[in-house]
Amino acid sequence: MSAPEVDQSGEIGHVHHPQRQVLLDFMKHLKLNGFLRYSYPMPDQERGEGWMLFLYERLSDDIINSFEA
């Protein structure tokens, strides 16, 4: 399974993936690592397919890279 696509280039970051369950698992991973500032997954209307969630605080590369989908 592919890893979620994390984009933190703007003031509010976002995470994209074709499967909602991967984002739910990513949320659990964030919570286990003490990160609680994110939205719930929603359909990705900008891309027209897949799912996305918002990040309201910058993630470290270690947290992103330690996630296994």
Locate each region found by the language model.
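N-terminal acidic leader/helix
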Residues: 2-32
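Helix N-cap motif at beta-to-alpha junctions
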Residues: 19-22, 56-62
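Acidic, low-complexity, intrinsically disordered interaction modules
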Residues: 32-54
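Short amphipathic alpha-helices in soluble, non-transmembrane regions
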Residues: 30, 63-69
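Intrinsically disordered, low-complexity segments enriched in polar/charged small residues
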Residues: 25-26, 42, 63
